């Protein structure tokens, strides 16, 4: 018997059975307990969801921006009222500590919906005078039906981040959460319906990558917003273009540098480094896993990092005192352990962790100890490739030019950060780093107002911020002639 029972699809304002006849299981990564059986969508189900979204979108788009704004604000209220309930589900599904999901996942998702609810009425066109008797005006119109494909590390937050600008601009969305963490997207669908979003405007189809491919290639989808790995993102982008030249937003992986200069406050720097590597058990795309430290302070910095790692409270995610939980799945655990073994084999010095935790209740979960490697080189696998787990690599440097060149020597470009008391150097360095999200003397905050996205192979487009809303609209130009029309023939 599962905890949450059979989970169906959400189409047209309510739950419906999938026609595939197939289900998949989702498990609690802390205990191995079966959480739910989830129905997998078929091609017919995807077609049904898209058709429902088209119908709902027509109604949604005819509402005034103020009406849409009020409905979205009601959804925000419901999310906040149910924060504890949703956080409990998210903790069971992802393995994140309850203190984290209570404070971050639903809160930040609701903040983004509230932000775009406020911007819905600010969508406007331009008037361009041509001559005394003629002018052009532009309209920003919704795209139509968009597809959202979520990642497993922030299920409800990602669903909120993708739906908020889409719905605020008058679009509908068919959303596919990760099959690893599929539960809370359905709860968001319930909330949108209860808030007054018309049936079909937000549909949820469940399944593996084949369902994502059906959405990406669907001729009636106007845009795809995807969060996930680089290689999968390339496939999504290729299929989106080949099928119908869809617009895309890609939030992909990272191998982000954190640069600690010789004048840094070492306590602040160590706090930032530990947060940038071990928050959410290291399963954050923006993690600063390449920690470059000036040679003159490397030993002192490393000691402060290790002191903080010892204070990490690994435990049951449902315990309020826990601040470090399991990895999301057995597959992710195996992947991370493989990287750790690679680091050892290539000569990195293991300073902390490096093992799976199996004592007591840890034995039934996907736990790996917070891991720190020293004496790392740029050519090591643990330094070059995204691990998506709690593995910090410490590298030393001597000069500003050197560390900037090394930090940029990657095909990733999602995030970067510097720690220094010299603000001139901080800004100078940040301006030269090839990354879309940067932090000075802090790490990790992504408020609704801040555009999020990467350079290079870390993504295309942005989420959050004013600019994102524009990418869920298309511009129509209209010329108006008030004077006499002069025929050509």
Swiss-Prot record:
E.C. designation(s): 1.2.1.8
Record: active site: 162 (charge relay system), 251 (proton acceptor), 285 (nucleophile), 463 (charge relay system)
Cysteine sulfenic acid (-SOH) PTM sites in chain numbering: 285
Keyword Zinc in record: no
Region forming the signal peptide: none
Catalytic activity: betaine aldehyde + NAD(+) + H2O = glycine betaine + NADH + 2 H(+)
Positions annotated to bind K(+) 2: 245, 456, 459
BP term (GO), one: glycine betaine biosynthetic process from choline
Cofactor(s) needed by this chain: K(+)
Domain of life: Bacteria
Enzyme class: oxidoreductase
Cofactor note: Binds 2 potassium ions per subunit.
Positions annotated to bind K(+) 1: 26, 93, 180
Pathway(s) it belongs to: Amine and polyamine biosynthesis; betaine biosynthesis via choline pathway; betaine from betaine aldehyde: step 1/1
Keywords, in A-Z order: Metal-binding, NAD, NADP, Oxidation, Oxidoreductase, Potassium
Site entry: Seems to be a necessary countercharge to the potassium cations: 247
Record-linked Gene3D superfamilies: Aldehyde Dehydrogenase, Chain A, domain 1 (3.40.605.10), Aldehyde Dehydrogenase, Chain A, domain 2 (3.40.309.10)
Residues annotated as binding NAD(+): 150-152, 176-179, 229-232, 253, 285, 386
Gene Ontology molecular function terms on file: betaine-aldehyde dehydrogenase (NAD+) activity; metal ion binding
Functional description taken from the UniProt entry: Involved in the biosynthesis of the osmoprotectant glycine betaine. Catalyzes the irreversible oxidation of betaine aldehyde to the corresponding acid.
Cited HAMAP family: BADH
Subunit structure: Dimer of dimers.
Sequence similarity: Belongs to the aldehyde dehydrogenase family.
Name of this chain's protein: Betaine aldehyde dehydrogenase
Organism per entry: Burkholderia orbicola (strain MC0-3)
């Amino acid at each position: 018997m599962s905890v949450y029972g059979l989970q169906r699809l959400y189409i047209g304002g309510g739950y419906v059975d999938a026609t595939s006849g197939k289900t998949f299981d989702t498990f609690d990564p802390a205990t191995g307990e079966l959480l739910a059986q989830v129905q997998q969508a078929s091609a017919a189900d995807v077609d049904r969801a898209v058709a429902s979204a088209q119908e709902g979108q027509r109604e949604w788009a005819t509402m005034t921006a103020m009406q849409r704004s009020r409905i979205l604000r009601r959804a925000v209220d419901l999310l906040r009222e149910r924060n504890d309930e949703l956080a409990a589900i998210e903790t069971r599904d992802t393995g994140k500590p309850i203190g984290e999901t209570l404070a971050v996942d639903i809160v930040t998702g609701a903040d983004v919906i509230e932000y775009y609810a406020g911007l819905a009425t600010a969508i406007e066109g331009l008037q361009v005078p041509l001559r005394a008797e003629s002018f052009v005006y532009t309209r920003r119109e919704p795209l139509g039906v968009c597809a959202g494909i979520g990642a497993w590390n922030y299920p409800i937050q990602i669903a909120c981040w993708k739906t908020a600008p889409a719905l605020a601009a008058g679009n509908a969305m068919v959303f596919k959460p990760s099959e690893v963490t599929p539960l809370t997207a359905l709860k968001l669908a319930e909330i949108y319906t209860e808030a007054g979003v018309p049936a079909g405007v937000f549909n949820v189809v469940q399944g593996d990558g084949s369902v994502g491919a059906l959405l990406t290639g669907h001729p009636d989808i106007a845009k795809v917003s995807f969060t996930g790995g680089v290689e999968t993102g390339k496939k999504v982008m290729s299929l989106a273009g080949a099928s119908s030249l869809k617009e895309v937003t890609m939030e992909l992986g990272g191998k982000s540098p954190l640069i600690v200069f010789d004048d840094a406050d070492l306590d602040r720097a160590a706090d930032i480094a530990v947060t940038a590597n071990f928050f959410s058990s290291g399963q954050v795309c923006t993690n600063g896993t390449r920690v470059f430290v000036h040679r003159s302070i490397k030993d002192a910095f490393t000691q402060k990092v290790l002191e903080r790692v010892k204070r990490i409270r690994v435990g049951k995610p449902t315990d309020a005192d826990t601040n470090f939980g399991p990895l999301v799945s057995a597959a992710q655990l195996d992947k991370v352990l493989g990287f750790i073994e690679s680091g050892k084999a290539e000569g990195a010095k293991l300073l902390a962790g490096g093992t799976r935790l199996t004592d007591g209740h840890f034995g039934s979960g996907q736990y790996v100890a917070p891991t720190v490697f020293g004496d790392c080189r740029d050519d090591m696998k643990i330094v070059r490739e995204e691990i998506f787990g709690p593995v910090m690599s410490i590298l030393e440097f001597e000069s500003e030019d050197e560390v900037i060149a090394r930090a940029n020597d990657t095909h990733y470009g999602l995030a970067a950060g510097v720690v220094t008391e010299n603000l001139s150097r901080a800004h100078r360095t940040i301006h030269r780093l090839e990354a879309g999200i940067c932090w000075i003397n802090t790490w990790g905050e992504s408020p609704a107002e801040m555009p999020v996205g990467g350079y290079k192979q870390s993504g295309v487009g942005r989420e959050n911020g004013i600019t994102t809303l524009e990418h869920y609209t298309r511009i129509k130009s209209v010329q108006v002639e008030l004077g006499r029309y002069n025929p050509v023939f």
